[in-house]
Amino acid sequence: MSGMVTQVRPRGRDDSDAHVRIGALAPLTRPGWHEAGRHLLAGMELAVREVNDAGGIAGRPLELVVRDTAADPGRAAAAVDELARLGVAALAGEYHSVVARAAASRADALGLPFLCSSAVLDALTERRTPWVARLPAAQSRGWRIYADFLLAAGHRRIAVVAQPSLYWTSGARILRDRLAARDGTLVALDLPEPDPAPVCDALAEQDASALLLLVGIPEPAVSIVRSVRRDRRLAGTLIGAPAGQPEFASWAAALAGDGAAIPFLRYLPERLGPLGARVGAALRERLAEAPSFVAFEGYDTVAVLAGVLRSHGVGRPLTAETWAQVSAEGTRGRSRFSRAPGATVWQWLDAPVQVVDRDPAEPGRFRVLHTG
């Protein structure tokens, strides 16, 4: 299997046998959302460098072994097998939920610890496992918060266009159930290909006050936004993108002002503390642009795993109590893990969730609209 390997080591240390290795999974090429993967990897690499500058893991340097998953579940599962053969102490990363699910299932089967950085799909594994934990809020929590935001803003009839995917289907179901419980309605619109323009006709016919985009970026998301913005019948219609597409610089570059005022979920606290501010500045320098919440997730993932490896030891099997004992200070707060009722993986239950958008007056600035 092809992939890239990134080694982050302290200056003057080059004894490869002494390294503690973490396998890092990220979408770095298309059809994966490679912009998200680049931010995720930047956060992980920065954290590894800081861990090594502070002495590593019991004096041993930490090293990332990176594999590009390219939004391919089969490729991710193969990467987990390969990384296990290479002797990594744990796995980290992944952005795409369906890909993370494949990686988590394989890690569980192999007994390899995996801390998922960014994927939110609730059912990361089919069975209860001690091996897998997750940093971001589960989809059922985040998307309910998004539905609550829509209801609080006065939206009761909401349209959605969705591409075929377990992730999008799960998200639509969460939204529909939450809205229905509060007298709201979610109406599914067809998504014609290759021209999404007929979405505007269907939206006008449904008399919905909002349209949610459960679709990929750049296309068809960019074309749909442009079509809706230019249709006079739809003036005042809210466009929403709960999966976070407007977070990244490519969204603003493609849509400029048309991409503003589109609420999305963002997994950051309302204000970063001193650690978050310092890491944010370092990430901005590393990325040559504002870091997304995904970059902070990458940093925090390695920070948590480094703490686990220091306290629990390298090469010792995890027990059901290992994740429960974690208490790691990260850029977005202190991470502690527990199991939600019915959950199969360990979860940071208090992970921050916001609904934000880009300010129409200044699209490079984000406005916090709602917190959960």
Model-derived regions: residue spans:
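Extracytosolic ligand-binding ectodomains
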Residues: 1-372
